[in-house]
Regions:
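Extended catalytic cores of very large enzyme megasubunits
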Residues: 2-197
């Protein structure tokens, strides 16, 4: 990529935007920005800058738990830039995945769930609320990223909302209204179908 100067105000504006709705009496985007700038080094990429900002915000979570939410939002913002924002397209990529080492078809989605999603893609795509990805704290998001979000060639390919919709469809199959209800309940944090971490 191209080299560009790191701008304090650009980092602070981004962190202020991602801090909206958090406790402004305790969460200080300026402090996080200052600490990030202190940790910079020549040649840092934008992804590394985001990782540094997230780790910096997470390190302040002992001062207030909303710093953990800010850290997760930084990670989610980065994930959203590197993944597709159409659920059915991601599901298609996961179903049609070809292993880069073996060259063989290695689907990550069952044919049955794939077919149900494709038959109902307009409804499912329209129902997903990507803003809900910003509701996780840092530990929760990193757990999802490490253990639950599916990868293609080592890179995370889907988003938390994609995973939740896949789970909801996997549970209810062709009962789409039930799947949407379950998706909403999971994505709003009312319950989860997680394995122990």
């Amino acid at each position: 990529g191209e080299k560009e100067d790191v701008r304090f105000d650009a980092i602070q504006e981004k962190l202020a935007r991602l801090s909206e709705g958090l406790n402004q009496d305790w969460v200080d985007p300026g402090l996080v920005t200052k600490l990030v700038i202190e940790g910079l080094y020549d040649g840092v990429t934008t992804t590394e800058l985001d990782e540094l900002a997230a780790e910096t915000a997470a390190s302040l979570a002992s001062q207030h738990p909303d710093y953990s939410k800010l850290a997760a939002r930084i990670c989610v913002d980065n994930l959203h830039r590197s993944t597709k924002n159409v659920f059915s397209e991601v599901v298609s990529d996961l179903r049609n995945y070809m292993d880069s080492e073996s060259g063989k078809h290695a689907p990550l989605i069952s044919e049955e769930v794939y077919n149900i999603i494709m038959e109902n893609k307009d409804v499912l795509d329209a129902h997903i609320d990507y803003d809900r990805d910003h509701n996780y704290d840092y530990f929760g998001f990193k757990t999802l990223e490490r253990s639950y979000l599916l990868r293609l060639d080592g890179n995370v390919a889907d988003r938390p909302q994609h995973m939740l919709m896949r789970v909801a469809v996997g549970i209810h199959h062709r009962k789409i209204e039930k799947a949407l209800e379950t998706y909403d309940l999971m994505s709003e944090g009312w319950f989860t179908h997680a394995t122990p971490t």
